Amino acid sequence: AGAPDFAGRMIGAGPQPGDRWNGDPRMADDIKEVLGGMGAEVVPFESRHFGQSYPYGNKIEGLATLPAGEPFIFFDTDTIVTGDIANMPIDFSRPAASMKREGTWPEEELYWPGYTAIWKSLYDKFGLDFESSLDLSQPDEYWERYLYFNAGWFLGADPGAFHAKF
């Protein structure tokens, strides 16, 4: 209703119960009904890597539910869209993310290893290239230097390729 010129699809992806969750993470039925009433498709996905231990990682896993090879925008459930998204000038060939990341980073402690060690350990755990993820325009150990996936939104040309990479 708020985006009459939008020709895309709205897909709500939700994790399903499994051994990576202590409880039931599914979307409430009334929420699914509201989304459906607005034309959204609600699709389930299995949490294979993250689940309850790192809920923010589930947004990466949810990308596997989206149509491969089609441009996508991911919005967190708490993202407020205030205009018609059909009128946004978007270049899907260049992956992008919101930059509202402050206030969610680890607090420095007396003997902590530092941002580089923390983030590199995560990339190493999943066999990803850490060096290519760094924003070298930012100083070493400054929080904005490190790619972060708790963005309110992110977009790209292919959700399958994005999911496979991360």
Question: Which role fits each region the language model picked out?
Answer:
Residues 1-166:
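Glycosyltransferase catalytic domains, chiefly GT-A lineage
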